[in-house]
Amino acid sequence: MIAFTSQMPHIVSNAYIKSPTARTHRGFSAGSYKDLTRVAWLNAPMWAELFLENRDNTLYELDTFIESLNAYRDAIASNDEATLITLLEEGKRCKEEVDG
């Protein structure tokens, strides 16, 4: 559970902020950017230890997330609006079910 609720947000945030675009975003970012990147400010040695101590669960969550990202990427790359809408609606529905 910790891999999903705590460790993954830190990994995603940290990976996201490494985009070359991050250095040129000023004036274009708002709440979504701030929400996603807040936890990138972290204690690297502590988090590395936590990721490795929970290695199997963290890898499971990472693999699941990568698979999901690839589905979005494939839909965008193939200009498949219907699939993209389905993916987005599924995500919204999951959020409503989980956090209603």
Task: Identify the function of each model-found stretch.
Residues 5-9, 40:
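Active-site oxyanion/phosphate-handling segment shared across diverse enzymes
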Residues 24-94:
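Interdomain hinge/lid region at the active-site interface
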Residues 13:
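Acidic/glycine-rich phosphate/pyrophosphate-binding loops and surrounding catalytic core
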Residues 1-6, 23-26:
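Conserved Rossmann-fold dehydrogenase catalytic segment
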Residues 97-100:
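Amphipathic alpha-helical coiled-coil segments
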